[in-house]
Amino acid sequence: MDELLFPFCGPDDILYSRCQIDPELYEYLAGLGFSFRSRYHFDLSDEKKHLPEADVFKRCMFRLAADQTQNQITADRMLQAVGSGYPEATGLAEMISPKHAAGGLHREAVWTHTVKPLTPYAITADTEVYLQAAGPFSPLPDLETVVRVNSKIYSNRLLARIGEKCYGMEANSAAEMESAGNTLLKQGPYLLKDPFGVSGKGNLLIDGEAMQRRIAGHLDKQERSGLRSQFLLEPLLRRGTDFSSHWFIRENGEKDFISVQRMMNQQQNYGGSIKADEALIRLLEHAGYFDTMEKALGILAEDGYHGFVCFDSMILENGDVVPIVEINARMSMGLINAYLNKVWETHGHTSWLTFLSLGLPEGFAFGRLLDALRVSGLLLTVQEGYGIVPLSSNTVMVNDILTSRRITDGLQSKRGMPKGRLYVSVVGRDNEHRSELINRLRQVLADLSVKVYN
């Protein structure tokens, strides 16, 4: 999914990814005006190279890059000792579009001995390792701060700190969970939330005392073995509209508003993002939503966080606004859509970012999808047009490529149907037109014998 960060890149920026972006997709995006340099760690299509071990392949990208950088530094020192003119920064393979082939290395040369900006999707435990190995970089918030503000416990307490209604109840043991749950069940079902669950994962709907007793019993056994419980319990609210607001907190505490995105959720899970219309913005202004966000952003800055932040919010069926459902102290899918829209909005268009979960037939290649979209007239080929923009290749192909390589190497016997996920920007005149485009995309995939599961 690291490929999805290309909308944040300028022509001289480098997008680091785990696997090589499909060259046809890379050239297609460059033709649309998304010009960037690409470096990658693995080229899975190169059958001359051994497949990486699973534990190596799944390592955090920061760890992979840090190890590569450290190995490169060691190699440079050895070569310099014997007078070699070994070039810098050759640790990761690179793709350069024709536009950069002649002189695209200037900016990196300038950055070699200065502080470089680093913009990760999220800060992880391995970020500090990479900063030390490959820096200097512009400052990032420390991991402890990021973990704390990402917790649903933090966001629940934040609501109290700024004087807003708190819907959640904290529970730090099985007994506390059962006690708080009994109170909530008098009003109806409730959600038992993992403080660090992402995109609805980690939420469990409790609809009765019998189910609650089973969960509490399981937690009690874990606690007696030495583990600790922590959950947030929230009533199952009658939601009307899910949306998110996106901001950037500067290191000095100044706040920049980026966008409000309406979320197309499927039950508790993320299903897509589209820019909020003027009617929703006016409703939020009238409800004091943006004043509440200013207070929340101020607290985040006071607590040491800076960088991109997303507030998941909702409007209930009765019209009440719940300003903070959770905080995502990182980039987000809605933010990616907001940056894509910076391109489409110059032509008066709006993008819907969504995805399709796929099952791939034998012999499928990403280039076949691009060709089929082009032949059908669905592929958006000019910024001022309408159509489908595929955003990533490896989310679609990585499992298929790994499966094929393992079968070839005798490590696997049955292919099954490898799964993938196709992220797309659907650029249309209005909601009806965008729905028509996504339905046509489904038909193109069906014609390619690709199964769509959602």
Locations of regions flagged by a protein language model:
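ATP-dependent carboxylate/phosphate-activation module, predominantly the ATP-grasp catalytic core
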Residues: G240, W247-L297, G304, N328-F355
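A long amphipathic alpha-helix within ATP-dependent nucleotide-binding catalytic cores
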Residues: N269-N318, G359, F364-G385
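Conserved N-proximal alpha/beta basic substrate-recognition cap immediately N-terminal to
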Residues: L4, S17-S179, T183
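Histidine-anchored nucleotide/phosphate-binding helix
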Residues: D2-G10
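Phosphate-binding site of ATP-dependent enzymes
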Residues: R214-N265, I315-P323
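Peripheral (often C-terminal) accessory segments that flank ATP-dependent C-N-forming ligase machineries
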Residues: T346-N454
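ATP-grasp fold ATP-binding core
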Residues: L159, L184-L205, E223-R239, F311, ...
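Glycine-rich phosphate-binding loop of ATP-grasp-fold ATP-dependent ligases
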Residues: G168, Y190-I215, F243-S244, Q267-L280
